[in-house]
Amino acid sequence: MELVVKSVSPETLKTATLVVAIGEGRKLGVAAKQLDELSGGAISAVLKRGDLAGKVGQSLLLQSLPNLKAERVLLVGVGKEAELGDRPFRKIISGILTTLKGLGGSDATLALDEIVVKGRDSYGKTRLLAETLVDGGYIFDEFKSQKAEPRALKKITLLTIKAAQAEVERAVTHAQAIANGMSFTRDLGNLPPNICHPTFLGEQAKALGKEFKGLKVEVLDEKKIKELGMGSFYAVGQGSDQPPRLIVMQYNGGKKSEKPYALVGKGITFDTGGISLKPGLGMDEMKYDMGGAASVFGTLRAVLELKLPINLVCILACAENMPSGGATRPGDIVTTLSGQTVEILNTDAEGRLVLCDALTYAERFKPQAVIDIATLTGACIVALGSHTSGLLGNSDELIEQLLSAGKAADDRAWQLPLFDEYQEQLDSPFADIANIGGPKAGTITAACFLSRFAKNFNWAHLDIAGTAWTSGGKDKGATGRPVPLLTQYLLDRAKA
């Protein structure tokens, strides 16, 4: 879908549908007032009849109003001005998009510039609006024999004042890149595990390298992984016929002297739990256990499209966790790339086993900050549900930057503690560390495990187990999170 920004009067635009705001108490917005005057009071007459009160969620379609070039005018309730937050604003925009799709017109124009969203300037409000529109058009029907009919709606014009046009256009550019990144992430996550395996993800990385010149891509096979001494990473994939892959993608958009930022993604393309087998119910959703790697792919795509002036290295630890005669057993001890030994008490705590070696590998790039992203623990879903990602780390400054980015992008995270006392739960009588810490504080002890491999750089861990996908029902599927948060963090660093 194409988004266009214009600073013209709404009554002069020839469009299939013109959308204007009506506040609670039948209060006409600026654009609605202009249209009402031109149409001889047609809008106020409809409102006086009580057809629309202006509450959030209400809408009314008017056909062929006199003296207007628009074929239709859609009145949309926006509630009380002082009470409109991010969530109701998104609901309003989603409702508009649903209505526009149903009308069948090829274009529409939104004259909603006067809407005030709490805590957001023109840029922030437009970002939210544009991301909602573009992401709302997402369809995944690759494996349907009956494809969805092509959408008639091809273009949406956003009206704004001349003074704000540059900021609104910047917001739209950022939003489109982020939405494209989210779409890429969702596509990868929604693919079935018989297609999306570690080798396939390596091929996706190489394809991205061909699409964007200047992106350096290296895919390390299982032989190289073993030679490097990544005993923990290798152990996770050794029970599968699908070999593991370590994917390294480097983008150098900044100065040569600038240290890179590093994103490390967990890429378990299917997680049975291994010998510590998961229950059968809902196991199909374990194809989403590569959501961390998928979100790194999506964030990188957004960065590449925006050509951000930063240096970025992306490291994806990809494997399939399967039971077999050659699979890792509970009680096995492995040696990590860092030299630390790990007693594997539960083979279903495999995400941290691939990430620890990837974090150690990231150290060679001398990064100024490392963020790992993983669908790591069910405990995070218990703690935070499906609305908020868990956030832990060893740098207060980095944590604050990510929290701020999440708030700005409406893709929130919440910090959990990483106190030394939790480290004791990982003690092992046979190795340097155990891979699980008992039933208490599962998200925290998982991050404590990772922290042992992140002592030499600023590090943060995003647990996206509750936010990477939606379970069950018609809305089941990958969400594309936390691409908005990560991209906003990098936009802030690039000051773009």
From Swiss-Prot:
Catalytic activity: Release of an N-terminal amino acid, Xaa-|-Yaa-, in which Xaa is preferably Leu, but may be other amino acids including Pro although not Arg or Lys, and Yaa may be Pro. Amino acid amides and methyl esters are also readily hydrolyzed, but rates on arylamides are exceedingly low; Release of an N-terminal amino acid, preferentially leucine, but not glutamic or aspartic acids
Chief location of this protein within or outside the cell: cytoplasm
GO biological process, one term: proteolysis
EC number: 3.4.11.1, 3.4.11.10
Pfam families referenced in this protein's UniProt entry, alphabetically: Peptidase_M17, Peptidase_M17_N
Subcellular locations according to the entry: Cytoplasm
Cofactor names: Mn(2+)
UniProt-annotated catalytic positions: 278, 352
Residues reported in the UniProt entry to bind Mn(2+) 2: 266, 271, 289, 350
Name of this chain's protein: Probable cytosol aminopeptidase
Gene: pepA
